[in-house]
Each structure stands twice: as C-alpha cells, then as structure tokens.
C-alpha cells in the first residue's frame, strides 16, 4: 500500500515538474490549439493555448512504471500501458495533423476509427493469448460471470474499447473537465486492482491520480495548456484497458457514466437534427456546451460533472 501512495506522489511531482518545463517549450514551438468554427464563440480567446499537454502525465506514468520494474511480479500492467500509448499515438497523429492544417480537424473519423480498432484487436488478442484476461463477462452487483466464445468476446470488446476511448475524448471540451472526471475513475481502478491483489496493475492508475492532480494546476480555468487528443485518447485507453485487465468491462457503464452521457448527447443531437430537419434537442452538444449556453461557468460544469463521476465510481465500488 505504501508503494501505491508513493507512486501517486511521485506521479504528481513528475507531472508537475514536466509541465513547468513542457509548457514554455510548446509555446516556443507554437504548438497551439485551433478553435472549431462551429464551436462556442466564447472559446475563441483560447486559440493558441498550447496543446499536447497530456505528455506531462503520460511521461510521468511511464517513468514511474519503469522505476517500479525491479519490484514487479506481474507485468500485465505494461499491456495496459502499451495499449494506452498506442491510443495516445493516434491522438498525437491527430494533433499533428491539426497543427499542419492550422485548424481543429485532424485525422478523418474513419482513419481514427480504423487505427483504434486495430490497436484494440491487438491488445485483446495478446491479453487473451497470454492468459492475462478472461473471456467471461462479469455482471456488476450480481457477482456472476457469463462465459462468451473468445471470438464473440474479442469482437464485442473491440467496439466497447473504441467507444470508450472516443467518449473520453469527447469529454475534453472544457478547461479541466476530462481530467477532473477521470480522476475518480483512476482512484476506483487503483482500489479495484488492490482489492483483486493486483498491486502491480494498480501502479498505473495510481500514478495517474497524482499526474492528473498536477495537470489540473495547469489546466484549470483559464487553462495554460490543453491535453490534446494525445492526452485524452491516452486516458481513454487507460480507462478501458484497466476495465478489461481487471475482467470487469461492464463496470464502464458506471465509472464511465459521464463519458457515456457526453457521447449520447452528441448522438441524440445529430439524430434529432436530421429527423426534424434542423431542430436541436440541446442548445449545443456535447452536453457540457449545452450547460455553458445555459449560463454555467466552466468551473461549475467541471465541479458538477466530476462530482457525478465520483458518485458513480462509489456506486461501481459497491457493485464489485
């Protein structure tokens, strides 16, 4: 337990220190965020804010895990890390494309989807072949697991992982939102891994607990840096990979409740717009922008959404 706490503390120190060095470098390289033309007009002042700030907590988590390597008995945490880094690399490609085009549209949706699908398939196959993952679907609150054919499990899981990864990305639309919502999720997975006796696996979410707290000092409104798709897709990868590594993918319904609401709001908005030939269900989607248009300040949105995430994580804990 002491090692877990030290890991979180070191993750915070490293992430904070890296942020202090990284942000001036990003400014010097003019790695600035472009604002979508269809986005909220009151976000225009954020144009030019350095992005790819997710490299802070990504690098911190890598360093922490490598430092713990001599003391590890179970290396499955590196499967989770590698998957997350691959998702983060997809995000990096997207961020890089945005910088080259000097607009807020990077990779096409189909390019991102195919890359994420390939990464998910490889991760699930390796986890299954190594015996680090079961093909039984655990049902929260009922304490039962339903066995599935490996092929069915892997194909179903691929789409869950891609959906989860993109949902975390969609949530990253207000200063401090994605990191604040993900923070209690990382606390949950740290505790869940400890409960299962998977102390080495708990090191990654523990390092991100510290890393995200430090990142929030730079990302709280008004943000000095954005995590970019590099950071948000990395976090999405960690969230879904941990759920599968702990054999509880359906727990994402609870711990990922805010992510799901954000994604569903977009789907409903688009569907309603097409069905009604131009009418909108929300003032703007994702739903955090709807609340902005209702007059909520960014800080209020972050606090409320993070509180909902924390409550749902507590509920998820009661179900395992």
Model-derived features with residue positions:
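Alpha-helical transmembrane segments
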Residues: 1-27, 57-89, 123, 127-130, ...
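Membrane-interface loops
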Residues: 23-37
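Short aromatic-rich membrane-water interface segments that cap or initiate transmembrane helices
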Residues: 47-48, 140-152
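Internal, non-catalytic "lid/hinge" segments that mediate substrate recognition, gating
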Residues: 107-108, 118-132
């Amino acid at each position: 337990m002491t090692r877990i706490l030290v890991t979180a503390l070191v993750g915070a120190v490293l992430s904070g220190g890296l942020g202090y060095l990284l942000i001036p470098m990003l400014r010097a390289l003019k790695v600035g965020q472009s604002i979508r033309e269809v986005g909220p007009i009151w976000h225009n002042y954020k144009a030019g804010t350095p992005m790819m700030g997710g490299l802070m907590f990504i690098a911190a988590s890598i360093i922490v895990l490598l430092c713990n390597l001599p003391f590890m008995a179970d290396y499955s945490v590196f499967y989770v890390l590698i998957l997350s880094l691959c998702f983060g690399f997809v995000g990096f490609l997207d961020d890089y494309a945005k910088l080259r085009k000097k607009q807020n549209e990077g990779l096409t949706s189909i390019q991102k989807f195919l890359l994420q699908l390939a990464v998910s398939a490889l991760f699930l196959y390796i986890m299954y072949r190594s015996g680090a993952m079961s093909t039984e679907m655990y049902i929260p609150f009922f304490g039962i697991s339903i066995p599935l054919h490996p092929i069915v499990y892997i194909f179903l899981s691929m789409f869950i992982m891609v959906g989860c990864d993109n949902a975390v990305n969609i949530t990253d639309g207000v200063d401090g939102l994605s990191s604040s919502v993900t923070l209690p999720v990382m606390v949950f997975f740290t505790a869940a891994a400890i409960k299962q006796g998977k102390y080495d696996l708990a090191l990654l979410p523990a390092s991100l607990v510290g890393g995200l707290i430090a990142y929030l000092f730079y990302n709280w409104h008004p943000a000095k840096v954005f995590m970019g798709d590099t950071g948000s897709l990395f976090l999405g990868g960690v969230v879904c990979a941990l759920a599968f590594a702990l054999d509880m993918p359906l727990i994402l319904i609870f711990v990922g409740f805010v992510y799901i609401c954000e994604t569903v709001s977009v789907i409903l908005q688009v569907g309603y717009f097409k069905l009604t030939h131009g009418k909108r269900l929300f003032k703007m989607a994702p739903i955090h922008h709807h609340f902005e248009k209702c007059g909520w300040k960014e800080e209020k949105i972050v606090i409320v959404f993070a509180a909902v995430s924390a409550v749902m994580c507590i509920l998820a804990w009661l179900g395992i």
